[in-house]
Regions:
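Active-site catalytic microenvironments in core metabolic enzymes, especially phosphate/sugar-handling
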Residues: 1-134
Length: 134
């Protein structure tokens, strides 16, 4: 897996393969997917939490990015943009992990980082997990 802080080169993998990997990585998460399962992903952008639809759309407008993996987004904006693009034949897709799921690894890292210099009180990571169930 190569890339920058939030752009990853996933060339050679399909949307379905990436979704399967994320489902195994986050077995308790309710992962939602928009796009053709057979889409050959080139590059993916990752946006934890909820940075807003304009951030997602800005990533999707790039020709080199054809998948965004996000925490959450307004369904009437980002999700509709991807669905419309996919249905119109553009190679675009979105995987929605859920807000909490997308941020939890970063919060665990943050707790470890803070624990290294905060001595006055204990610092611990408490996993919250996905609040939704099927």
């Amino acid at each position: 897996l190569e890339g920058t802080r939030n752009i990853f080169d996933l060339e050679g993998q399909t949307l379905e393969e990436i979704t399967d990997h994320l489902t195994k990585t986050f077995p308790d998460a309710i992962i939602r997917v928009i796009g053709d399962p057979e889409l050959q992903v080139q590059k993916a952008a990752f946006s934890a939490g909820a940075p807003g639809s304009q951030a997602h759309i800005r990533q999707l407008r790039r020709k080199d990015i054809n998948l965004v993996v996000i925490g959450e987004a307004p369904e009437w904006e980002s999700l509709s943009y991807v669905r419309d693009a996919s249905q119109a034949g553009f190679p675009k897709a979105m995987i929605i992990l859920g807000h909490t799921v997308s941020e939890e690894a970063g919060m665990e890292y943050c707790a470890q980082w803070m624990d290294a210099f905060i001595d006055e009180i204990p610092v611990r990571f408490i996993a919250s997990g996905d609040p939704f169930h099927q």
